[in-house]
Amino acid sequence: MDQTQHPSKAAQPLRSEKTRHCDGFRIFLAALSFSYICKALGGVIMKSSITQIERRFDIPSSISGLIDGGFEIGNLLVIVFVSYFGSKLHRPKLIGTGCFIMGIGSILTALPHFFMGYYRYATENDISSLHNSTLTCLVNQTTSLTGTSPEIMEKGCEKGSNSYTWIYVLMGNMLRGIGETPIVPLGVSYIDDFAKEGNSSMYLGTLHTIAMIGPILGFIMSSVFAKLYVDVGYVDLRSVRITPQDARWVGAWWLGFIVNGLLCIICSIPFFFLPKIPKRSQKERKNSASLHVLKTDEDKNPVTNPTTQEKQAPANLTGFLWSLRSILTNEQYVIFLILTLLQISSFIGSFTYLFKFIEQQFGQTASQANFLLGVITIPTMASGMFLGGYLIKRLKLTLLGITKFVFFTTTMAYVFYLSYFLLICENKAFAGLTLTYDGMNPVDSHIDVPLSYCNSDCICDKNQWEPVCGENGVTYISPCLAGCKSFRGDKKLMNIEFYDCSCVSGSGFQKGNHSARLGECPRDKCKTKYYFYITFQVIISFFTALGSTSLMLILIRSVQPELKSLGMGFHSLVVRTLGGILAPVYYGALIDRTCMKWSVTSCGARGACRLYNSRLFGMIYVGLSIALKTPILLLYVALIYVMKRKMKRNDNKILENGRKFTDEGNPEPVNNNGYSCVPSDEKNSETPL
């Protein structure tokens, strides 16, 4: 065969056998599947660790929401570069670089753990010596202990000068967002360009199915790591007197990011050995060469036509502005844009604080919440997505039919979500916050609850948080505020029991030597509601996933074919900015307003929340999601109306063209698909529905 026809063949023998092995489309698919698993794994680990990060860094929910939104911030920083230059560069290597950056970002997120020092769940005076602390009620003492002593606070502040180390977590999450950006668009375009004709959809479906392994692994890993104490391997775990049920417990949140970071770096390696264009069959090479010969010299060397180059820049700018105006004046596109923005905002905001909601409402640990959501919810969503795609194909739904189907599934999920209002639990019986200190009467406000007769003689530190559960089922902020005079326990401060608690004996009990034990009282009354919650969560996840597979199809069919890329890009920009970044922040800010007891940092500043008003938390969490979901249903009705009106307008055009052809002697004006054989005169006409 003539060498001039295949100039690349002369260089082929120079390739090493190792490179030949990597010159395959299947290897790219396998590596891309691995990267999908890694990026989904990292996302779930971040969401699952939000509460742990709040406690470890002593930050409110609004700051943790900003940290969570850092992923979208990083994504937006490079999305324009990736969208424009990605297809022109070496796509596999660019994806590999993204995976490597994603791994570095994940490791950076965990880095503060190694230089912050040990986690202190109690103040310095609590852990120094139990005999010299303010744990028990000190009667007739001259020293006032209504607050932490300045000496101890200054000492602790010097040790804990890590007030802004959470910024490293934010930067790490931003790096994860930067690294994730090229994976999906370049991976999908690579498959679409080089897969055999008709196989692209099968490959993409398989890819998304395999990606579901990531969330399942993420939930299981988070469940295991949440049981481990944050400083595991550094401290004697027998000396840790708090349990995962305690509001101060911090699990080994950093382990998940280390594991995910290493996996991301490993999955980046194969991409660097893949070619820019995969090895193809000889037939495909011949077709490619034939197409190459058909190119004109002007196409190959645009410099030879300077007039075209001079006119290109202003023409591109004018074309871009016209295209942007076209999609923003497209009412079908704008309605769908607002609709999906509300959907994404509701989903991201509620999912970010889902684990906190379960912990505060039903008294479940982070480990239990992660395990149940991973084992039950994710498989349910996977089956819903598969069934949704099957039903649409089986029923051969049109675009209008698909929109009605999604409207039905969204309505069903909305109805079941309303039932969450019935599952909101009442506040804990907490003396000094929801009840008077004697545990007998509710209080109107949790701010500055006055001392009772049972502990008015005690000299207590009100900033101290060492909750104890009395025999009466009431939780007290500390043994001192429970009026406990003595205690019994081992030297490691484990299984301590306090006695002669005057406030416990005043709660409808006979006077006597009543006791209290370390830790909050369990919320047994909410266990039944928790099982109902899990059931409704599975149903809601199923209906949500059932209709989610069609959202992208509605989007790309709402604009003209030549504006598809711009429409998808603008949609992604708006949704990521207003949904992915802002939703966790305003969800967190509203949740912060329900806090009844804040921790106090070593420097005396406000830290993380110890206890929320459960009822108010539930009303805001569920109510905010309902407030975002309600307009969605109205917008779906408007979208269906606009689609029907557009279909009617298209039908009228077909009839007019039919009469025109009939007048000219053409008896069959319409093709088999029901559309006119002659293109419409209107340049701005949309894709037929």
UniProtKB/Swiss-Prot annotation:
Residues 1-26, 87-92, 193-211, 276-326, 393-396, 557-565, 644-689 are cytoplasmic. InterPro entries: Kazal_dom, Kazal_dom_sf, MFS_dom, MFS_trans_sf, OATP. Its main location: membrane. One of its GO terms (molecular function) is bile acid transmembrane transporter activity. The modification Phosphothreonine is found at T662. SUPFAM superfamilies: Kazal-type serine protease inhibitors, MFS general substrate transporter. Liver specific. GO terms for biological process: bilirubin conjugation; establishment of localization in cell; gene expression; import into cell; liver development; microcystin transport; monoatomic ion transport; neuronal action potential. Residues 680-689 have a biased composition (Basic and acidic residues). Keywords: Cell membrane, Disulfide bond, Glycoprotein, Ion transport, Membrane, Phosphoprotein, Transmembrane, Transmembrane helix, Transport. Signal peptide: none annotated. Glycans are attached at N132, N140, N513. The chain crosses the membrane at residues 27-46, 66-86, 93-117, 164-192, 212-232, 251-275, 327-348, 369-392, 397-420, 534-556, 566-591, 626-643. It catalyses: estrone 3-sulfate(out) = estrone 3-sulfate(in); taurocholate(out) = taurocholate(in); prostaglandin E2(out) = prostaglandin E2(in); L-thyroxine(out) = L-thyroxine(in). Residues 658-689 are annotated as: Disordered. Disulfide bonds join C454-C484, C460-C480, C469-C503. The keyword Glycosyltransferase does not apply. Mediates the Na(+)-independent uptake of organic anions such as taurochlate, bromosulfophthalein and steroid conjugates (estrone 3-sulfate, 17-beta-glucuronosyl estradiol, dehydroepiandrosterone sulfate). Also transports prostaglandin E2 and L-thyroxine (T4). Shows a pH-sensitive substrate specificity which may be ascribed to the protonation state of the binding site and leads to a stimulation of substrate transport in an acidic microenvironment. Hydrogencarbonate/HCO3(-) acts as the probable counteranion that exchanges for organic anions. This is Solute carrier organic anion transporter family member 1B2. It comes from Mus musculus. The lineage of its organism: Eukaryota, Metazoa, Chordata, Craniata, Vertebrata.
